[in-house]
């Protein structure tokens, strides 16, 4: 499958799944435990990469309909974690995962439920 063969629905489902995985990986952890658990850190970072790449590929029409979703910030975070190999700030990763992702996931769930048919 070529990149352009994927639909908005697929990209949104990628975002939804990655957000669910981050929530699953971090449930029950505090920041100190998170930053010491390199497997969890790596898994969370990988899923932020997926979120950002998928967010970049969602059609502008959908993004304009839902301007409260931080589409650009999702991609920006993806770039930060993908290219700053040794300079990743775990506090930022933790903050986004624990304070912003739950609401963002609800927003993505809403888009999938309301808008997506055969995009």
Question: What are these regions, as identified by a protein language model?
Answer:
Residues 1-119:
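Solvent-exposed interaction patches of small proteins and small membrane subunits
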């Amino acid at each position: 499958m070529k990149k352009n063969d994927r639909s908005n629905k697929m990209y949104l489902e990628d975002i939804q799944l990655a957000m669910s995985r981050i929530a699953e990986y971090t449930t029950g952890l505090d920041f100190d435990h998170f930053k010491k658990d390199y497997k969890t850190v790596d898994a969370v970072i990988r899923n932020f990469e997926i979120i950002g790449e998928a967010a970049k590929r969602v059609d502008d029409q959908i993004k304009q309909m839902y301007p409260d979703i931080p589409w650009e910030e999702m991609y920006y975070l993806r770039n930060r974690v993908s290219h700053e190999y040794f300079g990743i700030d775990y506090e930022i990763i933790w903050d986004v995962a624990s304070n912003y992702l739950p609401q963002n996931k609800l927003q993505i769930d809403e888009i999938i439920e309301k808008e997506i048919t055969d995009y």
